C-alpha cells in the first residue's frame, strides 16, 4: 500500500502542508495541499488543529523542519574520513566552539567536502526545541519521522539535479526571516539566517502610501506599486543585500566556497517582493531563478490542486514530503531515534546516524 507522507512547513506567518502518496517505481501522487495563516493567540497549535480537522491528513508520516534561526551552525575540519570516526570525535571537537552545554543539544552534520580530511558543517539544536516540535505534532501524526533544518530539504532537492555543481545561493525569503544556503560541488557548504522578510517591504509600502498593511500587501503582491513605494522597498532591501554580499566574501576568503556565486535560486513568500530578484541579480551579477519542483519530478495531482499551486510558497513543503527518510544529504533531529554509547565518551550528545 502506498505510504502517505506529510511535508509540513511551519513558518512565521503560515503553515504549509503537502500530502504525498509514495507509490512504486518512483511515482508520487499529491493528495492534498493547504496553506493556513497563523493568526491571533491560537498561533501554530490552532493552525495545526485546523489542518488536521480534515481527515485526509490523518495517519500520515510527518516530515518537518526547525527554523534556521533557532539552530547553531559550525564549520570544522577533521583529519580523517569515515562516518564512524567523525561521529566519535565531533562532539569533542565542537565543545570549545560553542557556548551551549553539549548535554543540552542534539548534534547533526553534513560533510561539505572531503579528501584526506573532512570538512564538516555541523548543526546544533536545543533538545528542548526538538522536544517542543515533537510534542506539537504528536497529537496529529502517526509519526514524525524527520525533523530537518529550514530550507535545507529544498536545497537538497535541487542538489539532485545534474547542474547542481555550480556555486549556488538558495534564498528562502519568508515573512520575517530569510535562510541563505550556499552550495557548491553538489553539497551544502553553509547556512546563514538573516532578519529580513517580505513583511519589511509591506511595511515600507504601507508607510509610504499611508495605507493599512492589508492593502499594502495586496498592492505588493499585484506587483504594480508606485515609484515612491518602490523606492522605499529598495531602501529596506539594500542593507540585506549588502549583508548577503559580505557573507559571500567571508565564505570565499575562508575557503568554505570555492568561488563567487554563479547562480541564485529564490523562493519563499517574500521572494515575490517587487524588485527583489532584479536587485539580487544586479548585486551579484548573476541570473536569479525561481523554483517549481512540480515540473522536475514524477508527480500526479488533480487539476484543482495544480491550478492553485504556488511554487514559491509550497515548494518547501513538497521538498519535505519527498525528502529521503534514510541517511542522505539533510539533517535529522528526530527525537524518536535512540542514541548509543561510544561517541568519544559524550554519550547521547551526538545522535546516532546523522542524516
Range-by-range predicted roles:
Residues 1-355:
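Hydrophobic/aromatic-enriched cytosolic interaction surfaces used to assemble or bind macromolecules
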Amino acid at each position: 500500500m502506498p505510504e502517505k507522507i506529510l511535508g509540513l512547513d511551519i513558518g512565521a506567518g503560515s503553515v504549509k502542508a503537502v500530502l504525498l502518496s509514495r507509490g512504486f517505481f518512483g511515482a508520487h501522487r499529491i493528495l492534498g495541499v493547504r496553506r493556513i495563516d497563523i493568526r491571533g493567540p491560537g498561533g501554530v497549535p490552532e493552525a495545526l488543529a485546523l489542518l488536521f480537522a480534515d481527515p485526509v491528513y490523518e495517519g500520515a508520516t510527518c516530515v518537518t523542519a526547525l527554523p534556521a534561526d533557532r539552530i547553531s551552525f559550525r564549520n570544522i575540519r577533521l583529519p580523517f574520513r569515515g562516518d564512524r570516526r567523525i561521529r566519535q570525535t565531533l562532539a569533542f571537537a565542537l565543545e570549545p566552539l560553542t557556548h551551549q552545554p553539549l548535554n543540552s543539544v542534539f548534534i547533526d552534520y553534513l560533510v561539505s567536502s572531503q579528501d584526506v580530511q573532512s570538512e564538516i558543517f555541523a548543526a546544533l539544536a536545543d533538545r528542548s526545541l526538538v522536544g517542543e516540535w515533537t510534542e506539537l505534532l504528536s497529537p496529529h501524526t502517526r509519526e514524525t519521522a524527520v525533523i530537518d533544518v529550514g530550507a535545507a530539504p529544498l536545497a537538497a532537492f535541487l542538489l539532485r539535479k545534474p547542474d547542481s555543481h555550480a556555486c549556488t545561493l538558495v534564498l528562502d525569503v519568508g515573512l520575517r526571516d530569510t535562510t541563505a544556503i550556499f552550495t557548491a560541488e553538489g553539497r551544502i557548504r553553509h547556512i546563514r539566517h538573516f532578519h529580513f522578510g517580505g513583511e519589511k517591504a509591506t511595511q515600507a509600502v504601507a508607510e509610504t502610501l499611508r495605507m493599512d498593511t492589508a492593502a499594502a500587501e495586496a498592492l505588493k503582491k499585484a506587483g504594480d506599486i508606485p515609484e515612491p513605494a518602490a523606492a522605499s522597498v529598495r531602501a529596506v532591501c539594500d542593507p540585506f543585500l549588502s549583508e548577503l554580499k559580505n557573507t559571500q566574501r567571508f565564505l570565499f576568503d575562508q575557503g568554505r566556497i570555492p568561488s563567487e556565486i554563479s547562480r541564485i535560486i529564490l523562493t519563499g513568500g517574500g521572494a515575490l517582493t517587487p524588485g527583489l530578484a532584479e536587485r539580487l541579480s544586479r548585486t551579484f551579477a548573476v541570473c536569479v531563478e525561481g523554483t517549481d519542483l512540480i515540473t522536475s519530478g514524477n508527480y500526479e495531482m488533480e487539476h484543482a490542486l495544480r491550478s492553485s499551486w504556488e511554487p514559491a510558497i509550497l515548494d518547501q513543503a513538497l521538498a519535505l514530503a519527498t525528502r529521503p527518510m534514510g541517511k542522505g544529504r539533510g539533517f535529522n533531529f528526530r527525537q524518536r531515534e535512540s542514541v548509543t554509547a561510544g561517541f568519544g565518551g559524550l554519550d547521547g550528545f551526538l545522535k546516532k546516524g546523522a542524516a
